[in-house]
Amino acid sequence: MEEIKVSGFVNILKPTGMTSSDVVCKVKKILKTKKVGHLGTLDPAASGVLPVSIGKATKFFDYFLTKDKEYYAIVQFGKETDSLDSFGQIINKDDKVVESTQIESVLPKFVGEINQIPPKFSAIKINGEKACDLARKDIDFEIKTRQVKIFNIELLEKIQKNRYLFKVNCSAGTYIRTLFSDIAKEIGTIATVPVIIRTRSGRFDISSAITLEELEESKKVLLVKEIFKDLKEIEVNDEIAKRLINGRKVLASEINEDLPNSDFFITNKKCVIGLYKVQDSAMKRIVFLYEN
């Protein structure tokens, strides 16, 4: 197979049952290119937005990995599986009926910075091996507590007895399964999360996501400029460009143009040097894109 050089992003609508790595392999095959990576794991039992970077755009990995996320989740109170999702084995049941008022009363405790222990059935690496693989082998291990931020939790609808629909806006690294397991404990019961849909990941929204079948048909890759079309481009002279390329300090005052408060691209003769922001009155590199 001859490799085709392509660079940009694909906003994939990941189906339930596929791993994020499965999606990457499919994209490589469809686009006939090797340099492909996803921008934040989505659990096999979850579906929704999985941004995938291709070629030069893989340099944005760290940038997107820290961006906020939005999820819709259906939570089943009174039932617990070992993986806290629909793929696991039922390990506990509780007959307690959970009412909307009980849920609403505890939600404020989970807004803001909170600590959570990710589930053992997860892609977190423990001594180089995935936690989920160790869990399947019944190997005992501990996962460290992590701090995440929940911007908003909204109870949208009671679907049926003990089954509710929620919307969550949160920081990267948040485990929705753990969040609702902890909420259930606060109420005095247990829970599992049979449905998780990621509707937004940073700049990528579910409204523009495409299936792998649609990618197969269109081969459409979003260019970097399409994803960042709202960001300003700042043109600099050769001398400043050389200093930036070599990683030397450039003060904001040396650039003869009003610099935005948000991120911006710096270019020289139509060549993009990278994504920058102003920090401590100087240029702070976010993503270096220059290739000699």
What kind of feature is each model-predicted range?
Residues 1-15, 19-42, 46-49, 67, ...:
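Accessory RNA 3′-end/elbow-binding domains used by RNA modification enzymes
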Residues 62-77, 141-155:
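Structural signature of FAD isoalloxazine-binding scaffolds in flavoprotein oxidoreductases
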Residues 52, 73, 128, 179, ...:
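Residue-level signal for inorganic ion chemistry
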Residues 55-58, 79-80:
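Short, charged/polar surface micro-motifs in flexible loops or helix N-caps
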Residues 63-118:
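Acidic, low-complexity central loop/insert segments
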Residues 29-33, 51, 140-173, 177-188:
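The conserved catalytic core of RNA pseudouridine synthases
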Residues 122, 126-145, 151:
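Extended alpha-helical targeting/anchoring segments
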Residues 123, 130, 135, 162-206:
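Pseudouridine synthase
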